[in-house]
Each structure stands twice: as structure tokens, then as C-alpha cells.
Amino acid sequence: TPLLLMHGWPGSIVEFLHIIEKLAHPEKFGGNIEDAFDVIVPSLPGFGFSGRPSKPIGPRKMATILNKLMIENLEYENYLAQGGDWGATIANWIGYDHSKSCKAIHINCLTMRHPDGPQTKQEEEWQQRFNQDQIMQDGYRTQQATKPQTLSYGMMDSPVGIAAWIIEKMYSWSDLKDNNIESVYSKDALLANIMVYVVTKTFNTATWIYYGRREEGGRFFPKEFKKIEIPTAAAIFPSEMSEWPPRSYVDRMFNITQWTEMPRGGHFA
């Protein structure tokens, strides 16, 4: 079974290195070979080792590009898609626009919103908490969605600047023990992820996805939105960067076949 794994920002393919072999060869780890996947882990367009678009593109366009990769370039008849952060957003759009090709999606983050907004008191209370949370969360996102090049000129000449910009998110969005980032990530893992941005000189083009989504219409599905009917699994981690909407809200958007509230973990799971 082909399995497309998609990272987000400020992540990279480094996030998946420790699980690729387990998914591709479960028999080496006490599992059954019948459960093996063909694992495809691309750098998103503009990120890392992938090509750089000539101008900003958003997650919906990236969904089309990655669907083409799977169906036309790699010649799979169908596939499964998994993602967190932007990878989850792209998985949403794959489920919406390419349901004939993608048979199921798994997400551990939800950034898209229903065009009709909250419908119950519980959902309205969640929306209020989310809006309040964004006062402190939204600074980097606003910069990258409106003036990414201004930020990039400084960062492209400063590996320390890139490291600080990225590690602040890794620290803030993770389920740390005693506020120690090394309780979750080794220095090698942190530096490997940072160096993907530094060595490939893609800090600037990686931020473009925020600009691209704004041009695509932002976090809301279009007004003519119809529920995504392919099977959808959701993994909810307690230290996610933003609280998930209530289950009732999510059920109006997806055909949820598995809903798992994890005992620990954060945005980068």
C-alpha cells in the first residue's frame, strides 16, 4: 500500500526518518510483512530538497502537485496520505479534491475550518479560546503570510537566526518534561532539521506556503464545501499548538472513522 507522509513548517523529512524503516519493513521489528507500506516522504515544494516554485503556492496547489507525484509520476492507482501541520492541511485538500486517488487520510493537526463556522455553544466557546490563543501565536504566521521576503533577507545570512526561529516553535509546540527541549529531541535531531533549511537555502521559499494559503482563501474551506467522505483518522495530542475543535465540528467536515486522544505528545507528535 502506498503511504504518502507529509511534513509541515518548521519541520522537514527529518521528522520521519525514525519510522520509515518500521513502516516499510515491519517484519524487521516483530511485525508482519503483509502490513508493509511503500513509503513516500517528499520535501514539500519550496522546502528542503524539492524544487522551488517561481512564486508562492498554497497547500491546495501542493495537494494537486503531490497527487500528481503519486498517480502520474510514481504510477500508483491509489494511496493513503498522512500529515501534521501543513502536511495535514495538504491531506485535507487531497481528501477534498482528489478522493478518487486517495483512499483515506490520517491527520494529527487541524488547521482548516468549516465555512459555516461554529454551530453550538461548545463550538462557540472553543472558537473564543482559539481567538484568544492566536493573540500570542499569530505573530510569525502574519509575518510569513504577508511579508515573507523581509524576514528572509535577514535569515538567509544567519544560521543562528534560522535556528532561533525554528527552535522557538519546537520548544513551544512540544510536550516537554521540565521545560527541557532535550527531553523530546536530541541536539542531533534539532540540528539536522535546521540544517535542511540552511544547507538547501530554502528558509525563504518554505515560508511562502503561508503567503500562498492567504491567496488561496485562508483557513476556511470554500462556501460550496461538501463533507470529505473518504475515511479519516484523527490523532489528538494534548500539547498541540492550538486546541482541536469539538468532535461535532470535525464531524461536519470529515468522515471520522478513528478518533484517538493521545495521552502525551505535541504538535510534532
What are these regions (language model features)?
Residues 1-8:
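Short beta-strand element of the alpha/beta-hydrolase
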Residues 9-21:
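The serine-hydrolase catalytic nucleophile loop
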Residues 14, 29-31, 40, 44-57, ...:
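Glycine-rich "HGGG/HGxG" loop immediately N-terminal to the catalytic nucleophile
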Residues 20-36, 69, 73-129, 137:
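Conserved hydrolase catalytic core segment
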